[in-house]
């Protein structure tokens, strides 16, 4: 029996965070693609069907919250927001815009 390998898109403008998350996920048998910003993510979402999106909120250009709202209009993909914004109202805003979960930075 073949086990499904989940394909995850990690979007973060910080190269170090992007690579750290990718490395962890690959070590745990996930297929990972990365994007450096919202525009890069949109291009990849047009051509690949991902199972999960891990998305930083604070990025130059379009931020993760507006990207979440845009994606969720037409795509039921689960979105996990990844950010240093840890206030309760920040979490609520992200979840109200369609995010499925929220992971605060820094993380171990």
Kindly give the residue locations of the regions a language model identified.
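Acidic catalytic/metal-coordinating carboxylates
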Residues: 37, 63-66, 90
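Charged docking surfaces used in two-component/phosphorelay signaling
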Residues: 19-27
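Short amphipathic alpha-helix used as the core "switch/output" element in two-component signaling
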Residues: 43, 62-76
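Active-site beta3 strand of CheY-like receiver
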Residues: 48-54, 59
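Short hydrophobic/Thr-rich beta-strand motif most characteristic of the beta2 strand and flanking loop
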Residues: 29-36, 44
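The feature encodes the CheY-like receiver
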Residues: 18, 60, 87, 105
């Amino acid at each position: 029996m073949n086990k499904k390998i989940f394909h995850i898109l990690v979007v973060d403008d910080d190269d170090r965070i992007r690579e750290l998350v990718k490395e962890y996920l690959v070590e745990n048998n996930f297929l990972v693609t990365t994007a450096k910003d919202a525009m890069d993510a949109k291009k990849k979402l047009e051509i690949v069907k991902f199972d999960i999106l891990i998305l930083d909120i604070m990025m130059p250009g379009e931020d993760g919250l507006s990207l979440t709202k845009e994606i969720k209009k037409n795509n039921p993909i689960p979105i996990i927001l990844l950010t240093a914004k840890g206030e309760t109202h920040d979490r609520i805003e992200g979840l109200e815009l369609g995010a499925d979960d929220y992971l605060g930075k820094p993380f171990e």
